[in-house]
Amino acid sequence: VSSKNIFVIPNGIDFQKFSPKKNIPRIPGQIITTASADVPLKGLDFTLEAVSKLKKDFPYIRLVIIGAARAGGHTERLIQKLKIEANIVYKTNLTKEEIATEYANSNIAIVSSLYEGFGFPVGEAMASGIPLIATNVASIPEITSTFAELIPASDSKSIERSIINILSNPPKYQSRADEGRKHIIENFDWYKISKSYEALIYRIIQDFKC
């Protein structure tokens, strides 16, 4: 296929729903991550390992996981092995509005996936205006640009180090998060994306008009 016949149009992010909420205070030490499926591909193990290392110096640290663990499964056993049950909270069956509230409550978002398609949690975290740590894989750097802490996949040390950096200098990373929200609004607006599809469809019709 010729490159002139390839068009890339991203998905959009609902930046009105996922937004900073002045009436919702951030909970000190709260970190949020999404594990829509309890599978290794989500890289949750590495975030859990980082939390286990941090809890000594940051005993108030709390990881909110949007998703569910399999009863008696690998993740549940790992949490028990690391002795971090008190630092982990699972939230399941949430509406989009409730997920947006969890983001607004949090100080840091982590996407530790080993692979992602578009990566909606990345864009939703950025739209929420909170500092983001994300793996430098697949489409993630295309979404984040320079507005997130990009780290290697499968690297709990990098997650740990990034969390310490953010908790140690909130103003610096909050400023970048604020710019990250602007980046999402400018580049992942559903209205602009719909206009891109409209223009592309019109062009195709014109090109193939008999």
List each language-model region with its residue ranges.
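Carbohydrate-associated surface elements
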Residues: 12
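Conserved donor-binding/catalytic core segment of Leloir-type glycosyltransferases
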Residues: 24-42, 48-51
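Glycosyltransferase donor-sugar binding loop
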Residues: 34-35, 62-76, 92
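Nucleotide-activated donor-binding/catalytic signature segment of Leloir-type glycosyltransferases, i.e.
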Residues: 76-94
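Short alpha-helical donor nucleotide-sugar binding micro-motif in glycosyltransferases
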Residues: 93, 101-106
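Aromatic "clamp/platform" in nucleotide-sugar-dependent glycosyltransferases that forms part
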Residues: 114
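Short hydrophobic beta-strand element within catalytic cores of glycosyltransferases
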Residues: 131-134
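Conserved acidic donor-binding segment of nucleotide-sugar-dependent glycosyltransferases
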Residues: 149-156, 165-170
